[in-house]
Curated annotation (Swiss-Prot):
Subcellular location: Cytoplasm
GO cellular component, one term: cytosol
Record Pfam families: RRF (PF01765)
GO molecular function: ribosomal large subunit binding
UniProt entry keywords in alphabetical sequence: Cytoplasm, Protein biosynthesis
Family to which this protein belongs: Belongs to the RRF family.
Organism: Methylorubrum populi (strain ATCC BAA-705 / NCIMB 13946 / BJ001)
Gene behind the chain: frr
Positions of disulphide bridges: none
Protein name: Ribosome-recycling factor
GO BP term, pick one: cytoplasmic translational termination
Length: 187
């Protein structure tokens, strides 16, 4: 059986992947503020295939509570409208030629608290993913030390580096959550 390799860089990359995934998930959460990433999960039927909004239109934010969608192909305007209406965002598109405007309504206090709970759920999933990566790294180190490939001192030193990488990733996750929570609760 092959001896597993320990690569701290790989562990850090995998932890960073969990942080990036969290940022993407939180970016799609609706706040009272207009952001182009709000439309990222929406798929538009275009040319016989399902495409992300970014591949058929440009999304801009002319005002804090308004999204402006410039559809590149005039024939796609109704498809983009339909995709927005059928999404679970609860937004009502207003069309003016090839431009679709979306007014983002203010969220009430109860809805804000629900969004914060969802953000916490996503954050906990990211923390768990980071802890799994840490466990994998520590398991590899223990196996290497047990097999005599590294000394006990090296195992302890590298385990400390894995723990530091874990702490850094968790701190970054907490920072992302705090920022999103502030954005959601801002009236």
């Amino acid at each position: 059986m092959a001896t597993p390799e320990f690569d701290l860089g790989d562990i850090k990359r995998r932890m960073q992947g969990a942080v990036s995934s969290l940022s993407k998930d939180l970016g799609s959460l609706r706040t009272g503020r207009a952001t182009p990433s709000l439309l990222d999960p929406i798929q538009v039927e275009a040319y016989g295939a399902s495409m992300p909004m970014a591949q058929v239109a440009t999304v801009s934010v002319p005002e804090p509570r308004l999204l402006s969608i410039s559809v590149w192909d005039r024939s796609m305007v109704t498809n983009v409208e339909k995709a927005i209406r059928e999404s679970d965002l609860g937004l009502n598109p207003m069309t003016e030629g090839q431009t679709i405007r979306l007014r983002i309504p203010e969220m009430n206090e109860q809805r804000r608290k629900e969004m914060v709970k969802v953000a916490h759920k996503y954050t906990e999933e990211a923390r768990v993913a980071v802890r799994h990566v840490r466990r994998d790294g520590l398991d590899i180190l223990k196996k290497l030390e047990k097999d005599g490939a590294i000394s006990e001192d090296d195992e302890k030193r590298q385990a400390g580096e894995v723990q530091k990488a874990t702490d850094d990733a968790i701190a970054e996750i907490d920072g992302v959550l705090a920022s999103k929570e502030k954005e959601i609760m801002q009236v």
